[in-house]
Amino acid sequence: MHRRVHDAGQLLLSNVKGINMDPSFWHQRWEKNEIGFHEGKPNPLLVKHFHELSVAKGRRIFVPLCGKTLDIFWLLSRGYRVAGAELSQLAIEQLFIELGMQPEIEAVGNVEQWSANNLDIFVGDIFAVSEKMLGLVDAVYDRAALVAFPEDLRTRYTAHLTKIANKSPQLLITYEYDQSLMAGPPFSVSNEEVHRHYATTYDLRFIASTEVAGGLKGKAPAKENVWLLKRK
């Protein structure tokens, strides 16, 4: 089954000075199983705060840069439909295997759509996913996407996400730490920056903040901040 999807955004992601954001960086992380960013259980902040979105069961949740997160299993098991976007095809192969699903695979523009049982994953560059491809989503859950992009790309990413998700409400989780102590990803995103990206479109509510046990990678004391974004 394994074949690498063409990286439509390779030039975009590889031209960030000083940061290795070439798609091959992420492919190699998955191929070498260097996926410390992958959590072995549903994210506790999702479990605790998802209700803040007030989304009825049966609605469709978009999870950008989803990897093979168990958050998808958690959402599906609670009766939601899920859409995701992920660069690494290997991650999505593993996701469907772990979910016990056999996907139907279809080329859509410069990405592939893997679909089965209330789940649609767009495999390829998220910047190649359009509003039409994605279809209707009722909410966004962003735990791993905004913090994966360096500062140079975060403005473009947030504008793109807002557009393709049609300004749907969002549960956003960010990291905040002294960036000089550790090179990302994940990158530090300040509360001020969250406002800069989203305050024009959304009413923002800061829900919670929790210390990262042991710091990020054992190098930097850090907090995870939880935000609720509702369309103005």
Give, region by region, the residue ranges found by the protein language model.
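Class I SAM-dependent methyltransferase "Motif I" SAM/SAH-binding loop
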Residues: F62-G67
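Basic polycationic patches enriched in arginine
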Residues: R3-R4
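A short acidic, Gly/Pro-enriched loop at the edge of an enzyme's catalytic core
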Residues: K132-V140
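Short, Lys/Arg-enriched N-terminal segments with co-localized hydrophobic residues
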Residues: D7-N20
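A short, conserved alpha-helix within the catalytic core of class I
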Residues: A148-H160
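Class I (Rossmann-like) S-adenosyl-L-methionine-dependent methyltransferase catalytic domain
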Residues: M21-V55, K68-I72, G84-L119, V123-M133, ...
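Gly/Ala-rich phosphate-binding loop of Rossmann-like dinucleotide-binding domains
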Residues: L76-S77
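Nucleotide donor/acceptor-binding cores
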Residues: G58-R60
